[in-house]
Amino acid sequence: MFTMKKSLLLIFFLGTISLSLCQEERNADDDDGEMTEEEKRGIMDTLKNLAKTAGKGALQSLVKMASCKLSGQC
């Protein structure tokens, strides 16, 4: 009887450990997906900010050139 309880306890313990390892792996897989989405979002934001900055710089140079041509001080 004692041996049977001992072996059942051992099986329960090993089963619990294997289940927790499976859950950790599943959670790790889920985290990778979230990180990928964040990286994609970060890249898109960076590209958008780069385009805004380039657009502002080009617009400012066009405005300077137009004001110079209109005033005749070029």
From Swiss-Prot:
User: What are the GO cellular component annotations?
Assistant: extracellular region
Family label? Belongs to the frog skin active peptide (FSAP) family. Brevinin subfamily.
- Annotated localization: Secreted
Presence of keyword Ion transport: no
Instruction: State where it is primarily located.
Output: secreted
What is this protein's function per UniProt? Shows antibacterial activity against representative Gram-negative and Gram-positive bacterial species, and hemolytic activity.
- The species this protein belongs to is Pelophylax lessonae
GO biological process terms, alphabetically, are: defense response to bacterium; killing of cells of another organism
What keywords are annotated for this sequence in UniProt?
Answer: Amphibian defense peptide, Antibiotic, Antimicrobial, Cleavage on pair of basic residues, Cytolysis, Disulfide bond, Hemolysis, Secreted, Signal
Protein name per Swiss-Prot or TrEMBL:
Brevinin-2Ef
Q: Which domain of life is it from?
A: Eukaryota
Write down the InterPro entries for this protein, in alphabetical order.
Antimicrobial_frog_2, Frog_antimicrobial_propeptide
Q: What is the lineage of its organism?
A: Eukaryota, Metazoa, Chordata, Craniata, Vertebrata
Disulfide bridge map: C68-C74
Q: Read off the Pfam families from this record.
A: Antimicrobial_2, FSAP_sig_propep
